[in-house]
Each structure stands twice: as structure tokens, then as C-alpha cells.
């Protein structure tokens, strides 16, 4: 049962679980994002990361929340071998994707293919926050 004191948004991600040989099934994860610590990311005071799913080989997906203070950014342009996506929760920013900067804001969704260069810069006057997911702990079919 899920209850909310006010308006709520449900984000549903459907993904078939990929078992790993000799690894038991993961335990269900239920919680509230507000109860997950926001740890400083890469020693950058204005960048915080909340890890929503345990970093354990039993889980085949990572789901995290990044929060950036205005003016802070990912310090690198990165690529990943796996596809992944993000849902923008609050604030505004510029997202760099495949050689193009685009403005993003709350309720925007971005799907990123494998090996696509990407980065993020928080704009506006309030913190920017996004939920992202990616496949982890399994071989990526190439």
C-alpha cells in the first residue's frame, strides 16, 4: 500500500530482471527518498548523490538522485557502456548530450544510448535534482 498526504507522482520503470549465476535474488527495496542520505559527490560541495538501491551484485540496476546547487555541474563529460535515463525532478539546467546542450526542467525525461557523451550544469536560482537509472553488475550485450 502506498499513501501520500498530498499530490504525488508515480514514476514506473519496467525492466526485466537479469539473474546472475550463483547470486541470490535481491531483497525488495521500499523507502522514502527523503530518508536517504545525500552524500557529497566527488568532493564537490554543490553536488549530492542519494543511492536509492543498494550497491550489491544481486541488483542489476542502479537508481540514484543527483542534486546540484545553482552553478554546480558534473566536472567531466562522461560516457557509459549501457543505456540509461533520467527524470528531472526540480530546478533547471543544461544537459549536454551527444554534442548538444539542451535546457531541462522539472518533468523532462532523457533517454541516453550507450557511449553517448553527456554532462550537466545546474542553472536557475534553486537546486536542480534528477532521478537516474542505469543497468549495473551484468555484462552489457554489445
Where are these regions (language model features)?
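A short, N-terminal "cap"/entry segment at the start of jelly-roll beta-barrel domains
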Residues: 7-61
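Tight coil/turn sites that cap or link beta-strands
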Residues: 5, 70-71, 107, 113-115
